[in-house]
Every structure is written in structure tokens, then in C-alpha cells.
Curated annotation (Swiss-Prot):
SUPFAM superfamilies in the record: Periplasmic binding protein-like II, Porphobilinogen deaminase (hydroxymethylbilane synthase), C-terminal domain
Pfam families, A to Z: Porphobil_deam (PF01379), Porphobil_deamC (PF03900)
Cofactor comment: Binds 1 dipyrromethane group covalently.
Named cofactor requirement(s): dipyrromethane
UniProt organism field: Oryza sativa subsp. japonica (Rice)
Gene3D superfamilies named in the record: Periplasmic binding protein-like II (3.40.190.10), Porphobilinogen deaminase, C-terminal domain (3.30.160.40)
Keywords from the named record: Chlorophyll biosynthesis, Chloroplast, Plastid, Porphyrin biosynthesis, Signal, Transferase
Entry GO MF terms: hydroxymethylbilane synthase activity
Keyword set includes Transferase: yes
S-(dipyrrolylmethanemethyl)cysteine: residues carrying this PTM: C290
Protein name from the UniProt record: Porphobilinogen deaminase, chloroplastic
Gene Ontology CC: chloroplast; cytoplasm
Length: 358
């Protein structure tokens, strides 16, 4: 007895899979089957050209979206739907929220897992807040791009006073930053500073709930979140020297990936890159970590030169060392400027200063 005839759908399916037998022409009623398979194949072919790795906080996502939008605007092939994908990665710093950063220990608390994903090929580029990036980069990675720097100043946020100077003695200021803590206590020793972690929204909620009387946040982050109006006032750089690379976004890729390097180089803002390099060299010489209050700021002055200021302090604000430099706005000169300033403060502080911070 001959075998029963195949249904048209089965025949079409085997034909599409490359079956050596084709027993009958697909009937017209099977066209939707072929069309569905074709659409699925086309969708699978649209693989993202760039996968952006980022933390999942609202601010980190805002920075990733800014990067994506700049890439799409600069390169027409990336403007296609799905060409750029954002991949959220949770870092150690995101997972441990009940301890001060200084107590967690180690470097790269907000970058290591993202860099690991980059090296493993799970993402193509990594978007970081430069202030979170250790002074050394993992082997096999490169950071060819800094986006234009945002406002480097800190914002003072309070429901009852317009500035730190107006806070009554004994007022509690919330901050997870030893840099901010040391400078606050140096100028206002009557205030109390307590550990205050969480993303921007969490900290603002805690402030409204009365956990603290005031807090300080990076103005750059508030601006990127369209929340600048949240600031009660803005502290000048003279009042509060910013963190190294504050307000700067850095984008890393694998050092072997020429395609990504070319994409990122097209977005690089050279003035920012040079300023960040100067500040990070200062930090590198001091071998700063989460237990060391360090601040630095390099900028182009009205004459086009680099103006640099650096600070090293004890967490309680009882000891503060400061230095400044001016020189041509040139990469090699600025790196040397940061290095020289770091060595100056390291010598002023002496080895005992750093031993006491361990």
C-alpha cells in the first residue's frame, strides 16, 4: 500500500529546512506559514550592532541613553531600530547597600561586573561614571571616549536651610562620600555627617522622611535626570572641591575591537579627556581608595590654560592638604601636572597619614 500523501504544510516546512525531498508544491493556503518563517528569520538576522553595558540605576540608564543617542546621531547605520541595545548589569556596589563604601573594600565596586561582561563578549561597550572607574583599566580594555563633561559642582538639598552655613549646630548631613564629609567637617565642625547611600531618588525620599536634615548630590546627576530644580543651592568649587572626574562619562571597549574604538573615538570630547586624565593621574599617585578623601578639578581657564586644584584630607576634616597648578592645556603637560601635585601632597602628608586610614 503506498504511503499517505504529505500535507502541504509539512512539505513546505521540510523544503524551508533544506530537505532533499520535495513531494508536492506547497498549496496557496500555506503561504502564511512561509511568510511567518521568513519574518522570523529576518528578525533573527537583525542582531544589535552595539550592546551597551550599564548599571540599572536611573542615572546610569540616563547616561547609557545619552551614549546611545549620540551614537545613533553620529552613525546612520546605528539609527536603525534595534541596532543599539542596552544591557543592564548589577554590580557589587548595587548589591551591598547596608554598608559604607569604605567598609566594602576593593576598587571597581560599580564597574567590575560590567568590565567582566565586556571582556567575556557579552557587551560591546561599557558606560561608566568616570568617578567610579579605578585608575587602572582591566587588561584587554581601553577607554577611548569621554563625553562632554557636565557641571562638576555639588548641590545642597535641604527642606529647612538654604546652605550648609545656615544649618544649626548638631544638624545631620547625609552623605556616602568621604570627600564631602571631610570638607563639610573641615568648614563646619559643628555639623554631623552620617552614611547615606542609595540612588538619587532613594536619598531624596530619605531626606523628605526626616532621616537627615540635608544632603549633597552631584549636580551633574540631577541635571541628567532633569531634576536640577531639586537643588536648594549649588556649592561653588571653592566651597566644595569635586571628586576626581565628577560629571564625566567614560566609555570603554575591548582593546582588540577596532570597530568599537572607531565608533567611540567619534564621540570623544578632547577637553574633557585631558582634564580627566590630569585628575586621575593625581589620584593614581595618591593611590586613593574609598577610605581616602581626595578631590581634584582641572579646567580650561579664560586664557586657555589648564587650572588644576587638588585636595587630600582626613575623613574627620581635622587635616586638609591643598595644592594648585597652572600650565598649558596639553595632554602630556597636564598628566605631569597631576602627577607632580599628587607627589607634593603625598610628601606633605607623610606615610603615617595613609597608614591611619587603613
Amino acid at each position: 500500500m503506498p504511503p499517505p500523501p504529505r500535507c502541504a504544510a509539512t512539505t513546505a516546512h521540510h523544503s524551508l529546512l533544506g530537505s532533499p525531498t520535495c513531494l508536492a508544491r506547497p498549496r496557496r493556503r500555506c503561504c502564511p506559514v512561509r511568510a511567518a518563517v521568513a519574518v522570523q528569520a529576518e528578525a533573527q538576522a537583525k542582531v544589535s550592532l552595539i550592546r551597551i553595558g550599564t548599571r540599572g540605576s536611573p542615572l546610569a540608564l540616563a547616561q547609557a541613553h545619552e551614549t546611545r543617542d549620540k551614537l545613533k546621531a553620529a552613525h546612520s547605520e546605528l539609527a536603525e531600530e534595534g541596532a543599539v541595545e542596552i544591557v543592564i548589569i548589577k554590580t557589587t556596589g548595587d548589591m551591598i547597600l547596608d554598608k559604607p563604601l569604605a567598609d566594602i573594600g576593593g576598587k571597581g565596586l560599580f564597574t567590575k561586573e560590567i568590565d567582566d561582561a565586556l571582556l567575556q563578549g557579552r557587551i560591546d561597550i561599557a558606560v561608566h561614571s568616570m568617578k567610579d572607574v579605578p585608575t587602572y583599566l582591566p587588561e584587554g580594555t581601553i577607554l577611548p571616549c569621554n563625553l562632554p563633561r557636565e557641571d562638576v559642582r555639588d548641590a545642597f538639598i535641604c527642606l529647612t536651610a538654604s546652605s550648609l552655613a545656615e544649618l544649626p549646630a548638631g544638624s545631620v548631613v547625609g552623605s556616602a562620600s568621604l570627600r564631602r564629609q571631610s570638607q563639610i567637617l573641615y568648614k563646619y565642625p559643628s555639623l554631623k555627617v552620617v552614611n547615606f547611600r542609595g540612588n538619587v531618588q532613594t536619598r531624596l525620599r530619605k531626606l523628605k522622611e526626616g532621616d537627615v536634615h540635608a544632603t549633597l548630590l552631584a549636580l551633574a546627576g540631577l541635571k541628567r535626570l532633569n531634576m536640577a530644580e531639586t537643588a536648594t543651592s549649588v556649592l561653588s568649587v571653592d566651597e566644595m572641591l569635586p571628586a576626581v572626574a565628577q560629571g564625566a562619562i567614560g566609555i570603554a571597549c575591548r582593546s582588540s575591537d577596532d570597530t568599537m574604538m572607531n565608533y567611540l573615538s567619534s564621540l570623544n570630547h578632547e577637553d574633557t579627556r585631558l582634564a580627566v586624565a590630569c585628575e586621575r593621574e593625581f589620584l593614581s599617585v595618591l593611590d586613593g581608595n574609598c577610605r581616602t578623601p581626595i578631590a581634584a578639578y582641572a579646567s580650561r581657564d579664560k586664557d586657555g590654560n589648564c587650572s588644576f586644584r587638588g585636595l587630600l584630607a582626613s575623613p574627620d576634616g581635622s587635616t586638609v592638604y591643598e595644592t594648585s597648578r597652572t600650565g598649558p592645556y596639553d595632554f602630556d603637560i597636564m598628566v605631569e601636572m597631576g602627577k607632580d601635585a599628587g607627589h607634593e601632597l603625598k610628601a606633605k602628608a607623610g606615610p603615617g597619614f595613609f597608614d591611619s586610614l587603613q
